[in-house]
Amino acid sequence: MLFLAVFCGFLAEYQLEHVIENQREKQFMRSMVEDLEKDIAGLETESKLVKTQYDKLDSLTEMIYEGDLSQFQVTKMYELQRRYLYPLTLKLINRTELQLTNSGGMRLIRNKQVADSIIYYWGITELLYDTKNNINVHRDRAKDISFIIFNNKYYKHTEGFSLGFSLDPSKGEPALMTRNPAVLSEFANRISHMSDLLKRNYKQGRVDHQARNAKRLIQLIKKEYHLE
């Protein structure tokens, strides 16, 4: 009888732990879905911004390659390089990933298909960051050359952050610091390469692909864990 009582107590404790683990697992999956929904919003916004960015950078390179730099084109070049030659800063949500790491890792997710899909998603996120960082290196090199071509004195200097980057009329019509064909061509070549990377490697190959991954993963989690 004593053995039976001990066994029943052990069984009840085991069942309680099992229920608690199930609840924790399901809570992690709810948290993961919330993260993914935020990721989708961020990725879709990034996709639109990046398309505008590489379209405008393509316009800038076309002006340089055409070679007929009128005052109108020079003014437009000042606007485009300042407004669209910016670094990529996308950061996806890693809240649930950190929580799982601090709680014992993926062993808490006992559904193998879901666990494998989450690990795959996180792996693609790291590849996305690698691509982003690589493009930012090319951007930095192009930006270094821009300091030889464009004179910042023609821009309005305002306190705090501004998306306007307006030209200052009091400084007169903006002029290029150099019209050296080799310098301008290198600048255009670097921007053209950056634009191609933005279009194919980053937007199509990473951002749009990861948005689709996030949507599929949400569907899988909701199906396997019976979430609304």
Language model segments and positions:
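Hydrophobic membrane-insertion alpha-helices, especially the h-region
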Residues: 1-11
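Long, hydrophobic alpha-helical segments that serve as membrane-spanning/inserting helices
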Residues: 11-228
